[in-house]
Amino acid sequence: MRRLIQLLCIAMLAVWIQPQAADAAKAEPVTEKIIFIPHDSRPISSTQTADVVTKAGYEVVVPPTELLGSREDLGHPDQLWTWVHENIAQPGVKAAVISSDAMVYGSLVGSRKHNESRAQILARASRFTELHRAHPKVPLYVFGSIMRTPRTGEASGHEEPEYYRRYGADIFRYTLLRDKEEVEGLSRRERKEYEFLMRLIPKEALTDWMGRREKNYAVNEFLINLMRKNGTFHYLALGRDDNAPFSQTHLESRHLAAVGAELGKTRFQTMAGIDEIALLMLTRAVNEQRHEVPFVFVRYNWGRGADTVPAYSDEKIGTSINDA
């Protein structure tokens, strides 16, 4: 009889505990989270961007500031890889918005000034495959940059190698002519100018600048191919900052767009700008989680309107808005 009473008490306790546990679960829902790794520690890139999505009801999980790069600190990519693997497994993570520049070079400025080997940066880029394989249910929204081409040394803002302050305008003009030659050809006068610039710009400076660009182009091409062949990313965007309608940035963008053309704009884009792309990617992640498709209608003022080409862009503002 005593045994029977004990069993009845245990059964009653179990019946009482289950609703309590269910009520506790309802009372403390897991907050939906988005992992966000910005391309540097500037507020416009990190905290201000994250705050927008926080106000939409999400917890935005961002690495400690000391892991993010700045103008003085090029960043800590290997530590960021450790951080993302530790944090992406948190309960409630719905998506990850990640700067490839941060994960490969340490930061946006790091992508412009690094001295890493091609093998090293491609090895870091390949770790996206491992991340996707380990967490296949977390969509990866990855954004990177196509290296910029400032018009002058002064316009570079100390974010290019030191020689760019002296030869920046010449390097810009040299790449303008390279790009134009591919698109529409050069006049005899432009051909002579091109040959003159090749003699004027120190060979070691041009080799360093173009060599770094070649490595960064290889990384961007590698990321596109990860998307094409393996579907590693849910969405991939490459931004273009500080360039012109004819420039090395425009040339590389044309080539990369061709590599990823078959993916379509719902999976891959190159677009004008870079600092705003993180917010675009976070917004895309939120809209897709909520299955919402917002529509935005733009009206331009009198004048050139949509045909205006901003001073630091390679395309009409109307094209930039449509791509966004």
In which residue ranges do the predicted regions lie?
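Positively charged n-region of N-terminal signal peptides that target proteins for export
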Residues: 1-4
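Bacterial N-terminal signal peptides
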Residues: 7-16
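Sec/Tat signal peptide C-region and signal peptidase I cleavage site
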Residues: 20-23
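An N-terminal assembly and electron-transfer interface module characteristic of large anaerobic redox
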Residues: 25-324
